[in-house]
Amino acid sequence: MIKKASLLTACSVTAFSAWAQDTSPDTLVVTANRFEQPRSTVLAPTTVVTRQDIDRWQSTSVNDVLRRLPGVDITQNGGSGQLSSIFIRGTNASHVLVLIDGVRLNLAGVSGSADLSQFPIALVQSVEYIRGPRSAVYGSDAIGGVVNIITTRDEPGTEISAGWGSNSYQNYDVSTQQQLGDKTRVTLLGDYAHTHGYDVVAYGNTGTQAQPDNDGFLSKTLYGALEHNFTDAWSGFVRGYGYDNRTNYDAYYSPGSPLVDTRKLYSQSWDAGLRYNGELIKSQLITSYSHSKDYNYDPHYGRYDSSATLDEMKQYTVQWANNIIIGHGNVGAGVDWQKQSTALGTAYVKDGYDQRNTGIYLTGLQQVGDFTFEGAARSDDNSQFGRHGTWQTSAGWEFIEGYRFIASYGTSYKAPNLGQLYGFYGNPNLDPEKSKQWEGAFEGLTAGVNWRISGYRNDVSDLIDYDDHTLKYYNEGKARIKGVEATANFDTGPLTHTVSYDYVDARNAITDTPLLRRAKQQVKYQLDWQLYDFDWGITYQYLGTRYDKDYSSYPYQTVKMGGVSLWDLAVAYPVTSHLTVRGKIANLFDKDYETVYGYQTAGREYTLSGSYTF
């Protein structure tokens, strides 16, 4: 059975690995309840991706990392840097909470959903990904799941890397972490990435004029962190990063008007924290500030022309979290405060606005014999829509040694974004979107196979839709999502296998029509092995049929997009103990497919890279 001490000492060895790239159940995660705990004690399905996984996959974007994970469906308007959406278990892209080191991603407050095509892969040291409701812990947005991107580096040393590939792709990266005495360490990183790209849009989706040009992407990134241990229990940190991106895209063109087809994004974030890590009590206080400027403009006229748009947001947050060990588990409590300030014109609002939110939450985890219980409750006080409460509860029963049944229920919500509230078509009387979710799961270890199978249902109400007749946003939509998820990982001799299957039936509960851009079925398979010092990896992904809208003519028609099977091949060779050379072929069989109707994907792509560590 699961050892009770595992909840106290974070050193359990159990069968329950919850499908992760790092398959050790001892892996510590912080996202589930904001404090470190073994992944095996988290009842929600959880995936952990390490930097070693990212290097082995040779991913050049965050989207390429996330697309491999269970329950994730990513759509993108073309290649690198183009607009993308993350759907988790069939929910809307705006129903995914994206955190950077536990702090809400700033830009999501403007658009209502996180576009991770712009976030630099160089900053990602690990990813913790939890499926299911988490609003009772984090507040708004956590309906489909939570993605926590962690930038903290674990190992000291210096790495220099470079890569080249198809479509004139090039990447140069330098990072270092140095120990200053016994108690202080400094981390620095600089990254440059550029691709000429390709023409992403077929004629018809850009108005009356084709735009046969390359739609490229350029990103420059800087990162710095200082960490200091004052005593064995007290520590603190200061951290900051910024990136400067330029994206060329194909836009809808009206004759006689400027062609707005270039995006320039400036983003910077700073945070500082103080932590206490005692034997029974843990506490942390974190403050953060982030500022983003997102321009869209015609390069012939520049960013400051009247035809250009600017979305600008400043975000301030304070988080105070506490955790105490009680019995064979723990209790946590904390307060979140957030202020978002927008400039005039952001998200087409007529004036600048401030929005404040204060959340108070309580979490608990306890083991009683063969049973594990988890619960959370939260109350948010928002300056726009007032108070809103959420809660969730889960129970796990190890009915046979190595086999567990889990049942859970949770509520969650999504606050209306600033454009929906205050934009030209906005409605300041909007309520939050609300969700009720149920899930049942079995998991275990059978003949060396770590497996989990779960079924879930998610009813979402008060969805915010645009009314063509009144030209306003209203809470009038409903969605009903049912799904099955199965995951497994196992070894056969020198081969390591990781596989997942997703079936998602996501429908408009009023019209009973499928929700757009969600694949009904997905199969994902990762095979890794080593042969004569070469590390090989094969990635397979099947994307099932999905529906979308054809916007090339009015009235817009619903179109059905066929499924596709995709293969990637990656290989790495350690030339010396310091120098590693890597190569990859993505979309090995050059499949022609789209995830957004009318926006082409890249086809077969090659990359070659090398890294030197010392």
From Swiss-Prot:
Motif TonB box at which residues?
26-33
* Binding positions for Ca(2+) 2 per the UniProt entry: 213, 215, 249-250, 261
Give residue ranges for domain TBDR plug.
38-152
What membrane topology is annotated for this entry? Multi-pass membrane protein
Which residues does cyanocob(III)alamin bind? Answer: 83, 85, 92, 110-111, 251, 309, 517, 551
Under Pfam families, the record lists:
Plug, TonB_dep_Rec_b-barrel
Report the residue ranges that make up the TBDR beta-barrel domain in this protein: 155-614
Residues annotated as transmembrane: 158-165, 169-178, 184-195, 217-227, 232-248, 263-277, 279-296, 309-325, 328-337, 353-369, 371-381, 385-400, 403-417, 434-443, 449-458, 473-490, 494-509, 517-529, 535-550, 558-572, 585-596, 602-614
Q: Where in the cell is it found?
A: Cell outer membrane
Q: Does the keyword Signal apply?
A: yes
UniProt entry keywords in alphabetical sequence:
Calcium, Cell outer membrane, Ion transport, Membrane, Metal-binding, Porin, Signal, TonB box, Transmembrane, Transmembrane beta strand, Transport
UniProt-listed GO biological process terms: monoatomic ion transport
> What InterPro entries does the record point to?
B12_transptr_BtuB, Plug_dom, Plug_dom_sf, TonB-dep_rcpt-like, TonB-dep_rcpt_b-brl, TonB_box_CS, TonB_rcpt_b-brl_sf, TonB_rcpt_CS
Q: Where does Ca(2+) 1 bind?
A: 199, 211, 213, 215, 250
This entry carries the following GO cellular component terms, namely: cell outer membrane; pore complex
Where the protein is mainly located, per its record? membrane
Which interval of the chain is the signal sequence?
A: 1-20
Residue span of motif TonB C-terminal box? 597-614
Q: Molecular function terms in GO for this entry? A: ABC-type vitamin B12 transporter activity; metal ion binding; porin activity
What this protein is reported to do is described as: Involved in the active translocation of vitamin B12 (cyanocobalamin) across the outer membrane to the periplasmic space. It derives its energy for transport by interacting with the trans-periplasmic membrane protein TonB.
User: What's the protein called, per UniProt?
Assistant: Vitamin B12 transporter BtuB
